[in-house]
Structures are given as structure tokens and as C-alpha cells.
Amino acid sequence: MKLVKLIANLGYGSRKQVTLMFRDGRITDAAGEVLYADDAVPHDQVRVDGEPLDPPHGLLLMLHKPTGYTCSTKDPGRVVYDLLPPRYRLRDPVLSTVGRLDRDTSGLLLMTDDGALLHRITSPKAQLPKVYEAVLASDLRGDEAEVFGSGTLMLESEKTPLAPAGIEALGPRRARVTLVEGRYHQIRRMFA
């Protein structure tokens, strides 16, 4: 792949903008020598403004999502993509969140541009456990382990029961919940 296309695909700018970066001497090798658009240089030796290039396709990011942000790309409010360097929004292929966390939920969020990895992790067939820590408004009742683990718990307005879930009490109003599925506001609705 030509350097212009590679650098543009990593989100540093359009091909035209990247061509201008070459013209301005902003693209160099690891030794600081100015590169030209048709040079053949290994990815790890290319620098933009003295900084190494971002990783190519196959990027996997771990992000601590604070409350108040959504995992959508189209939300008019604050989105998790705003927490990343602006060029990450221009990557090709695009970065996608691995699952979602509600606006009012904080925690680890994975992001990737690897569609196959995304599918392997998020596919319901994978049954990969997802662990959440819930802070509750009232004390645990004490029967949550039995109810959540039964595989018969029905959420309001749902037609199928939830898959069995694990729960560990961390305090009177704190619990660690392990799910193998992810329904809309599932944990909030399980404790309702």
C-alpha cells in the first residue's frame, strides 16, 4: 500500500491533505529523514510530525468510559469517540465499540477496527461473560443469586427469560454481576 493511502486510512487526513504533509516535510522516517509519497518504508519506521504512526488495521483500544457519554456515532450529545484523538474518527476501516454501555454507566469499553474480532466477541453464540459492578439505591434482598441464576427471570415487556447470570454481593448496596447476554438496560431492569 502506498504511504499516502496508508496514512490517510489511519485518519491523519484526506489523501490530498497527506500529500501536502509530504510536500511540507512532515512525514519522515525514524532517523528524521524526509520521506516522499512513493518511498517504500516499513510502517513502524514512518513518523508524522516526529511521532510514530498509529497502529494499522487490527487496532484494539481499551477506554474507560465516563458517565455522560454514549456509545453511538450519531448521538447529538457527547459520544465516546470524542474522547479519542480526532484522527481516530477518520480511520478506514472505522473504529467500533465492542458492545455498549449506557450513558449513565462508566467502565471499560473496548473499541476496534477489526470486524472479525468484533463479531467473535459480541456474537450471542460466543457466550462471553461480561462483568459489571452495580451500585444500588437500596439494599440487596438476599435472593438475587437464586433469581438471577435460575434462567427464568423475565424483564418487563420481554417475551423470553434472561440467560442465567452470576452475582456476587460486594456490600449491602454493591454487587458484581456476570452476564453472557446484553439486553437494553439489562442490569438496571434486573434490579428493578
What does each of the following model-derived ranges do?
Residues M1-A192:
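Basic, flexible Lys/Arg- and Gly-enriched helix-loop patches that mediate nucleic-acid binding at interfaces
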